[in-house]
Every structure is written in structure tokens, then in C-alpha cells.
Amino acid sequence: MIKKIIFTVTPIFSIPPRGAAAVETWIYQVAKRLSIPNAIACIKNAGYPEYNKINDNCDIHYIGFSKVYKRLFQKWTRLDPLPYSQRILNIRDKVTTQEDSVIVIHNSMKLYRQIRERNPNAKLVMHMHNAFEPELPDNDAKIIVPSQFLKAFYEERLPAAAVSIVPNGFCAETYKRNPQDNLRQQLNIAEDATVLLYAGRISPDKGILLLLQAFKQLRTLRSNIKLVVVGDPYASRKGEKAEYQKKVLDAAKEIGTDCIMAGGQSPDQMHNFYHIADLVIVPSQVEEAFCMVAVEAMAAGKAVLASKKGGISEFVLDGITGYHLAEPMSSDSIINDINRALADKERHQIAEKAKSLVFSKYSWENVAQRFEEQMKNWFDK
């Protein structure tokens, strides 16, 4: 029987994250809702304490590295006598025992391998949020994924592994709150304007440039229509992504005032942006493991027009809980799909059906319950 769960993740963002960090958000939102006692072990970034008690069942232990340690052991000599992986194990041994605990490692097979090397008998779970070619020391590893798409991906590559689905989630309380009333006014959007919304990274795999190209044509065919883009167009300073971001900014500038670049927004602000949308568009160019933008838009009661690649199509069902973008995707096909969705007399009913679906399956409360059931299924025997 498991008496304590240790959650951990790569040493990049502290928990709870102060910005958009999906994996760290998942850990925090689920851990604090569990009835099984648990501890989070994560990196200590500037402004975070040594320790944070969240509630009676959840606390956070922060792992800090001094500047001298980093310079001497991680940069100059690369000896690293007390690495991040060992510090995670030390936290486990401080709060529980190897026999009574399981360590859930999020989205880093490298960290899984490092912990396994240092503790061959530890109970480990690998929680993958993306499709990476597996490099695990345990052929029969226990793996959690958010979608059927990702489950099939890992089962094909690790046939002896136990792969189970626990989805990503959203904060139901946030999406029950009344949204900000004056956001349209702040963005200089008329109340009767049709608003298309894109939210996500400004990167080639998300398809935003193709959407901008389609919108440039669409605005000549439809009057009083706006495209709002939520995402940081300066996230990358150099390389291909930076070049892509410049192309996106140039395309938006060419469109003019009908395209509103709203920049990056905090997770707490996103429900206000979904509220102003008539249609939320997810033009992904790659297979998505899940898609939080689609789930959040559905939770806000908004119609979603999305790529059917990967895990998105498991909950965005064409004509039932949303609409699919036709393949192969092009400017013309996107225009046709936008017009089709906006013209559908059942659009609001479809959006309401989608809202009911995500509230019943993807709230953090439901996700935490599914995770807890899976842990008991694997370890309480």
C-alpha cells in the first residue's frame, strides 16, 4: 500500500508556476486535491521559500543550488556530487520510506533514468505529457499519459509497459466565474464584431502563420471580423523560432487593426479572452498529445475549430462537440472551415454540449480522482 507520493519534474520551473508551465501546473493542481499524502520536490527559483505547506496532504520541498555549487560542480568540474536526482531521493527519505512511497516523474526520461540508477528498487511512475522516443531502463515501466493517442504511441514502442490514461485538466471554479466585461472595449473591438481567437505558442507546429494568411483573405470576404492572437511573439530570441515569430509579426502588421496581437497572458486571464470569442481556432500542424486550449475554450462555452491530429480529436468531435479543420490544411480550407462553423445554426448547442463534456471529465477534481484510482490500482494490491 502506498502511503506517500513524491511528485517531481525537471529543474526548470518552481511550483506553483508563476506563468504558463503546463506540466508544473498539472502537478500542483492534482497534488493539492489528493486524499493520498504527497510531497512535491522541485527546483527552487528566486522568490520561492525552502518549504511550502499547501494543505494537510500536500507540501512542497524546494531544491536549491548555490551559485558556488553551480559554478564549481556543474560548470567547471561537472562532478556534481549531490545532483538533483539524489536530492529528490533525499527528500523522499526525509518524509517517508522507499517501501511506502512511489515517485512520479513528469516528462523527463533522463530524470527517471538518473533516479533509477541511484535507487534500483524505488517504485517509479513515468508521467509523459509528450511523444518522445522512449529511453527507459525498465521495459515494464508504469507510464501515465493524457490521451489515447499517446497511449498507443508508447504501447507500440514499449509493449511490456503498463500505460494508463489520466488526462490534463482545467480549473472549474475559474470557468464558473463571471468574465471581465470590458475586454472587448480594451481591445477596441465592437460589440457586434465576430471574433476569432488563437491562443498558444507562436511556433511553426501550432500553425498560427497559416491562420494569419487565411484571415488576410477572409477579412476581404466578411466584414466586421477580428482575429485575436494570444501568445508571446518574442518568446524566442534567436534561431528558427525567432525567424518564424518575425514572420508572424510581419503578417499581423500587414493585416492591420483587424488582427490584435494580445501577447502572452497568464492562465488566470485566459478565460476572459475565451469569453470574447465567437470561434476558437486550433490549427496545429503536428499531432498533439492533448490540447489544453481546446479544453479551456470548451469550458468557457465557446465553439472550437481544431486540427484532428493526435489527442485533440478524442474530445473535439466534428459536429458534436466542435469542428475539425480539413486536411490537407491550407488558407482556402481554413477559410471554408471558419465559414462553415460560423454559419452552423447548431454552433451554440454544440458549444454547450462541449462545455458539459469537459466539466464532467476534465476538471482538476475529476483528474485527481482518476490519478488516485490509477495509483491504487497499480500499488494497493
Curated annotation (Swiss-Prot):
One of its GO terms (cellular component) is plasma membrane. Pfam families: Glycos_transf_1 (PF00534). InterPro entries: Glyco_trans_1. Signal peptide: none annotated. Pathway: Bacterial outer membrane biogenesis; LPS core biosynthesis. Keywords: Cell inner membrane, Cell membrane, Glycosyltransferase, Lipopolysaccharide biosynthesis, Membrane, Transferase. It is a peripheral membrane protein. GO terms for biological process: lipopolysaccharide core region biosynthetic process. It is found in: Cell inner membrane. It comes from the Bacteria. GO terms for molecular function: lipopolysaccharide N-acetylglucosaminyltransferase activity. It is an enzyme of class 2 (transferase). It catalyses: UDP-N-acetyl-alpha-D-glucosamine + [lipopolysaccharide] = UDP + N-acetyl-alpha-D-glucosaminyl-[lipopolysaccharide]. Disruption phenotype: Mutant lacks a terminal outer core GlcNAc residue and does not express the O antigen, but it can invade epithelial cells as efficiently as the wild-type strain. Its EC number is 2.4.1.56. Transferase involved in the biosynthesis of the core oligosaccharide region of lipopolysaccharide (LPS). Catalyzes the addition of the terminal N-acetyl-D-glucosamine (GlcNAc) group to the outer-core glucose II, the last step of the lipid A-core oligosaccharide biosynthesis. This is Lipopolysaccharide 1,2-N-acetylglucosaminetransferase. The gene is waaK.
